[in-house]
Amino acid sequence: MFSRLGGQEAGELAHRRFVLGDTSPEVMAAWLKIALPLYKQKNLDPSAMERVVMNREATAWFNRVGGEGRQFDMLADVPNIQCPTLILGGQLDPMLPIECQRDIANALDPRLLSYREFEDCGHGVIPDVPELAIPLLRDFIKNQHTSR
């Protein structure tokens, strides 16, 4: 998805970071400039990257070979969720592909699930389409409050 959204350079950068586990300062600087903006598809704020705070040591530890970022898989535990759950999925999400979001939704008890996909959205559905996502979020919260 990174290649699709940002071209060969973004795809190669994602490969270096996630497949090879390269969290070197040069890769992380390129990540902030090239790949991180791809998480959103709309309402891009050119100064947003200036406000990003990242702990490089924690990121390197999490994404190292053998680290949690490479092994973390919660899917087997998803059926244990016993509370109402809202998933707003962006079909252009490079960080958690829509197929993975569908797997999570399919693993949940359908009586507890509110699920909606957004065609032209990335990882941040609310910033991408606030006019659609915020009412869904408000309704979800309101319905939980009134159903008690």
Locate each region found by the language model:
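Conserved hydrolase catalytic core segment
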Residues: 1
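Alpha/beta-hydrolase
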Residues: 4-76, 83
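Alpha-helical elements of Rossmann-like donor-binding domains used by nucleotide-donor carbohydrate transfer enzymes
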Residues: 30, 34, 102-103, 132-139
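Short beta-strand/loop motif that positions the catalytic acidic residue
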Residues: 81, 87-89, 93
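Active-site acidic short loop of glycosyltransferases
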Residues: 82-83, 110
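Conserved alpha/beta-hydrolase "acid-adjacent" motif
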Residues: 94-100
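Active-site-adjacent alpha-helix of alpha/beta-hydrolase-fold enzymes
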Residues: 102-113
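Catalytic active-site module of serine/aspartate enzymes centered on a nucleophile-bearing elbow/loop
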Residues: 111-148
